[in-house]
Swiss-Prot record:
It comes from the Eukaryota. Pfam families: LRR_6. InterPro entries: F-box-like_dom_sf, Leu-rich_rpt, Leu-rich_rpt_Cys-con_subtyp, LRR_dom_sf. Residues 13-61 form the F-box domain. Keywords: Leucine-rich repeat, Repeat. Signal peptide: none annotated. This is F-box/LRR-repeat protein 12. LRR repeats lie at residues 75-100, 101-126, 127-152, 154-177, 178-203, 226-250, 252-278, 279-304, 305-330, 331-356. It comes from Arabidopsis thaliana.
Amino acid sequence: MEDVSESDNNVETSIIHLPDDCLSFIFQRLDSVADHDSFGLTCHRWLNIQNISRRSLQFQCSFSVLNPSSLSQTNPDVSSHHLHRLLTRFQWLEHLSLSGCTVLNDSSLDSLRYPGARLHTLYLDCCFGISDDGISTIASFCPNLSVVSLYRCNISDIGLETLARASLSLKCVNLSYCPLVSDFGIKALSQACLQLESVKISNCKSITGVGFSGCSPTLGYVDADSCQLEPKGITGIISGGGIEFLNISGVSCYIRKDGLVPIGSGIASKLRILNLRMCRTVGDESIEAIAKGCPLLQEWNLALCHEVKISGWEAVGKWCRNLKKLHVNRCRNLCDQGLLALRCGCMNLQILYMNGNARLTPTAIEMFRLHRADITLRTEEMMVIGPDWRLYAQE
């Protein structure tokens, strides 16, 4: 019989001998930035695995952290040269945030050619040097974007149309504080991107809303806080029939007492969250129509809606059977009789935000507490309600 020595049976093994796919699996499950960096410092092979495994990148100057492990340990001033070095190294990125990188300009985005079509999410918040030329570069290199944030960028209708035509799979778009974007750009976006789910256009003073007319039924989230919306624009926003979240707080004076009646016409029957805060001119006609026509409504912000009177509050109490949260802070015309209507109705109400209502007596409030112990009364005034625009598509 052949004598096999013990040394012949012992095969030297260690983590170094693992195949690349196993090492990549290990890297993806490291939690901390320090562990990621240490992994790449082991050897050239592991550094390459780190490079091709990284899917997300952002910088310390970013306003929100998508993933702590994606933070780059660098100084806040990200230059074009620095960005080029990083994107040539991490060419498999799917999520990139350049938010707060204020020194970048249009030519800086040429480096996007490296992640290119793999990139799905791009944040350019407060990149003041990015204009339509930079957006054209994005459109050329990144056709598969689904989430784009251009908050406070110098983009116009031309750039938005270019992006919309190139990135047909766009689902979530943030155009807040983009003063050069008007209804023409919104029309291009809503007609080209048929998978659009959420759009944020807060403080875009050139948008009236008519550009949304004929939008896709997938559009379920629109944040139009402090826009110059018109009645036809409101109708346009809900025209797709899929709207679930609508924020038109601080709506322009063009909306009269009956200006929001179309919301209750049945087109917005899926509406669950409605923010009408500071819609001071909206009256009972609109409130009654919405209360009847939006049976799924779960949260409604009517803070500072001074023209809502007794018949409006009675409609809310009678028809809003699924309402869980109601905001009535500083409503001048919420009186004891209106509060009684809310007390006798809204049987699923859980939280009532209420303070600064001068016409309410302490007795009426105490009676409300006594008869509706199931409702929590809160005095704080909520400026923002509902889900974040980025998270809506993930729900």
